Amino acid sequence: MSSIARPPDPCLVAIILIVRSRAGPRFVFHYPPNPLSENGLKPALRSRRTSRSRTGQGYKSNDSSSSEESGSSSDEDEDEHQHQLHSQSNNHSQTHLSGSVVSARRSSNFGLDDHVTMSVSPGGDSQRAGSIGSSRTLFRRRGGNSDVEEESGAGSDRQEDGAGTAGGPNRPPWESLLGLPADVWEKLLSPSPAWHKRRFEVGINDLAFIGWPVFVREDGTWRKQKRKKKKEKKKARAEWEGGELGHNENSEDAPDGEDGDGEGGGGLKLIVASTETLSPKHMTFSEAKRASVASNLAARASSDCLDVDDKDSMTMFNVVFVLDPPLLEYSMRIKELYDNIIKKFAKALKWEQARTDYVWREAQHITHLKEKAKERRTSLNTLYSELINQSSLARAIYTVFNSISASKIASVPLSPDVSISLQIPPLTSTPYLSGPADKAYPGLWLTTADSVTPVDDPTAEEIAAPHQVLAKNFALLLLDNEATILKDVEASGGALAPALAHYLRCSKPTKSFAQISATSGIPLSTIQMLASHLVYWRRARAIPPIHQRDTYIVSPNCDLSKLEVATAAYQAAFPTLPSLPKMLSALSGTPRPYGSFIPSKDHKETYFAILAWLLRGGWVTQLRSFARVKVTPEIKMAVEVALRREEVDKYLRKSRPSGPGKSGIDGEEGSGAEEVDDASSSSSSSLSSHGSGEETPMPGRYKLESEMRLEHSLLDRNTSLRTASLILFPHRASPLESRWLEEIVSQFPDKPRSANRLRGHGSGSRGGEGDPECAGICTPMKDLWPTYIKYFNGLDALEKIPIRESLKRKLAWQVLTRLGMVTSQQTSIELDPREQVLVSVRHWNNELIYFQFLIFPRDINSIIPHHAR
């Protein structure tokens, strides 16, 4: 598989709603009505299915290491499911679906007709590699031992007119899915209570069935009731879990006794005002609690009046998502859909079920409509139109399927009081250009500036949770007009609306989050939360702050097919300024700071707006600088001579106390040490005389043994002393690399050459030695080195230094120029060869730079693209 990060690919085939009452499981609803039809089956899905091998091997699934996501279904349930699945699949024939034109290829309905192979996974990150063979003998042998009491009465509650077979004459088309009758699916996808609030996964040939089953509690309620405290504490305004800030949700699936979703629990309190912005209407925490308590009390009162054998109460519901992910991306696609959609949608339904008995009421309503349609012999399309129009739950499933399949945000109103938004976070940028065998995504932002990775934030943990807080040194680039976003925020209302509106008015792409916090008075943590909210919901993008000293080039990944449309939009936004083709042509030349394109100070804000427009559309990208410390052979030799002298001195100090009575062996060792000392001294003298232009004659100077001794380091025999090296990670330098760095610093001059030139100006005059504008020129490099060295790892862009270290960019680039940073601008700084210790390149991709640094040819310009020099 390619290393290129791919955008969300939901691979959705269908969504199924299964409920279980005391009468047994029920196949309530599924969408689309016929996933195998030409309209329901996507071309990508067909190509994936036909490209897979049919070797007869099943899927392998690995148990999750998480205790919350682990667990296993009972053998009895699995045996019953397998037995029913086998018996039904052998008897079924062609299913009649309205509008379907796939009868000719029905023999390949994902392999469900003839060879149904299944594996049940307890959750976790599954890996589907081949398949388990069709164990029909095993199904028959173990099927007789099944014991599913709750499903025993299912037949009496369902159709009695020949519906037991898939090809029954009176079976309506909506009572089958993927070529199998509904009673097979309702038993297969109705797990035991051991799966309560855990990832339920079933693999059947090329399809994966993923759900998050929810069971009623033993006391008949759907939420754990907290004991009332004597002193009522003032409760903050909060919403149900899983809303628009649900992407920051860290609560795990708690067991029934530790229900994290209950009132007063962490579930509700963690998502303060989470669903308010850009959603219709919401309930406060106190209102939700009162409604939930009233609903539970009513449920208890009604249950007391009902007979113990009452069959009209729901005990479980399971919303199952049917997926067909690519084989090599199976775990990744399953995980992203489970974490972002399946689990959150089921939690929202659980919350509404506990509050208003929502799922059970809607399930009964859908069943009633289906029974009426069966009596009237309504067509499939007509029935689904009625269901979507009259049932909010059917409409919610319809909305989720269509929106998530298109990688859009699904805004789902469950009731007048609650609306949720679900999405799979899209890919906003890529550090790679697609190769010949990879699918191209033109227009995607090409950069390695990741606002949350440990590379861009050294203080971040290496194993960071998804959707972590944005780095404080990044800025916010709105992806739509500010007035439009403000209008939507103000219209949505909610607790977040005033804070978001205030932040949007203060935010600028030229100011980092930390700078906005300092000037506006908004706490940094609040700004990071609001910015994360906007980024997650596709209203903004986190970027390095725009600056006139930064360099921008036309992105190699820009979508030139949209140039004509973009030119018209650009002309409407900036009618009196150079056209889009002219701006792109100017930025395609020799890279230079963006400030050189600005005609005057009066045009500064306007040209920043142009740059923001170009970045928003992926037309340009920042040309970033990367550097590593170069260790020359002279530095290596000096360190090696010092190391060998230290070893000889250490040996001589140990041998001196032995006195004149030392043994012959000691004498031989002493003579050997003297020989090494002589060789080191001769090499040192040779180097010093070579540096001064003189050559001191020395006995044995040209001996091969002495020459061989100084070809490799004493500390690392694999390190050559005759070639230059790069220090990959200065903050994790090896002992030998640390000695090299010490030697480099020791050779820095105490007084910079530029300081001598500026000394005549005086300390108080403009441009003199005491001028802060010249601090980068006049300050000794030994004092500046500790601040800068941690960025010379080839991974951190040097443009970060002024932002992170709160330095003026002019000062930072003066120091980098002294260290050997190559720029396109001519500089008047007098350079000292002793300070030129960097090898630098400019590119958008630090991975490419890392590869270039590793091969390190003598002429590094030979591998750097022309536009990156």
From Swiss-Prot:
It comes from the Eukaryota. GO terms for biological process: cellular response to amino acid starvation; meiotic cell cycle; negative regulation of TORC1 signaling; positive regulation of autophagy; TORC1 signaling. Residues 237-250 have a biased composition (Basic and acidic residues). Pfam families: HTH_NPRL3, NPR3. Residues 128-137 have a biased composition (Polar residues). Residues 1-23 form the signal peptide. Keywords: Meiosis, Signal. Residues 30-175, 222-266, 652-700, 751-773 are annotated as: Disordered. Residues 61-73, 85-98, 680-689 have a biased composition (Low complexity). Residues 251-262, 666-678 have a biased composition (Acidic residues). Mediates inactivation of the TORC1 complex in response to amino acid starvation. Required for meiotic nuclear division. PANTHER family: CGTHBA PROTEIN -14 GENE PROTEIN, GATOR COMPLEX PROTEIN NPRL3. Belongs to the NPR3 family. This is Nitrogen permease regulator 3.
